[in-house]
Regions:
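Conserved alpha/beta-hydrolase
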Residues: 25-47
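Active-site glycine-rich loops that stabilize anionic/oxyanionic intermediates
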Residues: 10-14
Length: 139
């Protein structure tokens, strides 16, 4: 057996986003789990009001408790906000390894650089032209 991998979804995601990754890992001998973050098990168009008051610390505390209950330290795999959560769990020594897929940056890190703005500045006008052509009524 390869070990245990815990897949952590991002904001507005659900554990289902990991179904293909889990199948891939399980096909290679891994045990996997993908817990739902607090208040992320409702349909996306009907989020519970509590979602707006749940903090990153709440998510980390929930997963901290789940990982401490496991018989071994897992590999944590996280995407976006789940990547930041995975990083924080690794920092607490709760994982044997971490895989961070485009993680959200910690609060003290400024991830937006001028080059990012330039890239978006080129894309946005093109999209606006395309959108205006699509949405402009025809006579």
């Amino acid at each position: 057996m390869a070990g245990l991998a815990v897949f952590i979804h991002g904001m507005w995601g659900t554990p289902d986003v990991w179904r293909n990754w889990r199948a891939f890992a399980e096909g290679r001998g891994w045990q996997t789990m993908a817990p739902a973050l607090r208040h992320h098990d409702a349909p996306p168009l009907e989020p519970p009001p509590e979602l707006g008051t749940t903090s990153l610390g709440d998510y980390v505390a929930d997963l901290d408790a789940q990982l401490r209950a496991l018989p071994e330290k897992p590999v944590v795999v996280g995407h976006s906000m789940g990547g930041l959560i995975a990083l924080l769990l690794c920092a607490r020594g709760l994982a044997s390894a971490g895989v961070l897929l485009t993680p959200a940056p910690p609060a003290s890190v400024i991830a937006l650089r001028p080059s990012n703005l330039l890239a978006f500045a080129r894309i946005v006008p093109i999209r606006m032209i395309i959108i205006s052509k699509i949405t402009t009524p025809r006579d």
